[in-house]
Amino acid sequence: MKAIILAAGYATRLYPLTLHTPKALLPIGKKPIIDHIVEKMNTVKELDAIYVVSNDKFAEQFADWAKTAKSHVPITVLNDGTTDDSNKRGAIGDISFVIDEMQIADDLMVIAGDNFFTYSLKEYVDFFHEKNRDCVCVKVWEDEAAL
């Protein structure tokens, strides 16, 4: 199983906070969001590679992060070549880019790099194997006002 962490957005709605730092590298607690994601990925024994897809503006920051990331599997950072919001590929385009670039023909987990979550990826992958079907995880909010 391979994993793609989508981190190629420009986060312009969060400027100036994200003017020089991608959302996935912003801290929650004492570590970047992406560290929380990789920590969850470390529980998935089937996982043998993590691909972080970024843009040209932030790829070097992710490459620096990957050098010290606490991962049980190799992390590869891919630069999708985009330079701003006007030429970004979008989530589906970046997934396709990574699949083509890395020639992935394996089960694939895709996670947005700016999403903080507390559920178990191990349990989610176990569910995936049990159902033997593609799976999508969503959060249902009972109280719309809480959104």
Where are the model-predicted features located?
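Conserved core of the sugar-phosphate nucleotidyltransferase
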Residues: 118-147
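Active-site glycine-rich loops that stabilize anionic/oxyanionic intermediates
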Residues: 10
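Short beta-strand segments
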Residues: 6-7, 110-112, 137-140
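Conserved N-terminal catalytic core of the sugar/cofactor nucleotidyltransferase
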Residues: 2-5, 13, 27, 31-110, ...
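Short alpha-helical oligomerization interface
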Residues: 19-23
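Conserved beta-strand scaffold positions in the cores of enzyme catalytic domains, especially
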Residues: 25, 77, 134-136
